[in-house]
Amino acid sequence: MIYKTGVRILQATVGLESSSRALLIRFPLKIEVPSLLTDFRTVVEIPFSEKLDGRLVLENEPSGRAEYVLSGRKAVFRGPLLRLEKKTSDIRYSLWGNQGFLYRFFLYLLELRHRIFSFHACGLYDEGNHRLFVVAGGAGSGKTVYLLSGIARGLKLFSTETVHFRFERKGLTWFKGSLVDNIRLGTLVRDFPQFCPSEIAGKSKDEIWQKKIALDLAAFESQPDVIVEPRLVLIFPRIEEGRRGFIAGRLEDKRKAAKSVFDNLSQKIAESVVLYDQLPVPGFDDGPLAEARLKASFALVGHKTMEKTTSVLSNPVECWGNLLDD
């Protein structure tokens, strides 16, 4: 028997087929560190259809070898998938983990089918001034520091991890992303105690620096889910504990700014990943897709709404510098 369902994230859709019901993604998703809710605002179950944007086929073969094949917009996994799910060392790098296959497949389909581009970034919205701050960077760059300090300063949450945009007839349009952030408990205790959850009680210093939690920040989200033509500030940070001062370097050269944007937009689509500690999955990127993304990167940095594109070198306390000045 074949079990079928579908998934929608923003406008993109994927049909799932599995030889085992136990392999299918389980709804509703939980708020936890490996959840796709730390990547996207909503992950919605929809009816299966042959006409969806992508297709994912899972064939559990207990005695077989793990294999992955991509043909067009159809991906097939076969092998001892149920056993791999149970024994993997890091469930984030699995079919449904927040660093895994479906996460990257959806980013690919959003670009390919809907021309929706996705920053690896947090987004904060100044509702009074109609200004969107996009803080772009990988793990350890300082996104969480900007996220929590921005909320503490009165900005509204637009996304914790993934910020989406598309050029539309009505103007440059931004789509709300994830509202849950994976944060190390030690960061909360040291820098943002006002956000500490009750579970921190009784934890040792070693424990709080080893453990991450999925912090639901939906209480601070912006009113609009879609923002059209906001004033835009794009920040590429490097935040270091113990560093003094605030150093901002505006990216005046549009070529360098566009490259920084392109590199960030490409990261999760282009990189290869190992699932279940043993199954390599190449990136989805190709020439036409990359060319369209580079064109979008130049269009973004040159757009009339772009107030500044800047790099920042600072510490958690001074990271905003004069960026919030109107």
Where are these regions (language model features)?
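Post-Walker A alpha-helix
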Residues: 146-147
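GT-A fold catalytic core of metal-dependent nucleotide-sugar glycosyltransferases
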Residues: 156-157
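Conserved glycine(s) of the Walker
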Residues: 141-143
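A noncatalytic interaction/capping subdomain that flanks phosphate/NTP-handling catalytic cores
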Residues: 1-136, 152-153, 164-326
